[in-house]
């Protein structure tokens, strides 16, 4: 006789919709929320691979190891990548992001880690979001380590793709993640030929 490892019934579409509404409330977002079946690296990579492509130029803010990983994914997508690297013991400033955008007006995608778990630094997303919004680039935020520990307002901050995970400050299980997706982001994802 065999027994299922987990004898829980599968979640229905209604259950997922209810969870997505609760996550939207947590993020104070009116955007769509998608819950992938996987840990946060899955939607992080998916957002980058959907938002970047050959012919696009990305500003990749590197304040720790996750920013380095994002740069590798962006290059793998064929995007031209401008790395804005700051010392791992410091946060990036909106002024630095603005200078990078001004120096490279072709930038159409920005990736940023809100809070680097490996370094303990938190980047000023509200101020950076203003600069990115004024430039017009799509803005992706890794909020895996910050959700539940820091204020997180993707709509107010102009974040188009906001990825969260349950396993860090929220104390939840690994393998649970979500992403809020703006209308601009959906258009960009739909337009990606890959």
Predicted segments, located by residue:
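A glycine-/small-polar-enriched, mobile loop at the entrance of the PLP active site in fold-type I
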Residues: 1-37, 41
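Conserved PLP-enzyme active-site core in the AAT-like
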Residues: 2, 9-11, 30, 42-194
């Amino acid at each position: 006789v065999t027994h299922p490892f987990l004898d829980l019934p599968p979640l229905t579409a209604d259950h997922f919709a209810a969870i997505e509404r609760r996550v939207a409330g947590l993020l104070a977002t009116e955007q769509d929320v998608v819950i992938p079946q996987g840990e946060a690296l899955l939607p992080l990579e998916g957002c980058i691979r959907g938002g970047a492509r050959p012919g696009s130029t990305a500003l990749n803010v590197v304040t720790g190891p996750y920013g380095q990983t994002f740069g590798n994914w962006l290059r793998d997508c064929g995007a031209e990548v401008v790395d804005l690297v700051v010392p791992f013991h410091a946060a990036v400033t909106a002024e630095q992001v603005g200078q990078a955008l001004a120096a490279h007006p072709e930038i159409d995608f920005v990736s940023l880690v809100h809070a680097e778990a490996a370094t303990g630094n938190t980047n000023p997303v509200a101020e950076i979001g203003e600069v990115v919004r004024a430039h017009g680039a799509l803005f992706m935020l890794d909020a895996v380590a910050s959700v539940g520990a820091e204020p997180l307002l993707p709509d107010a901050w102009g974040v188009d793709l906001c990825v969260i995970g349950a396993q860090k400050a929220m104390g939840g299980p690994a393998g649970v993640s979500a992403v809020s997706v703006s209308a601009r982001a959906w258009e960009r994802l739909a337009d990606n030929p890959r």
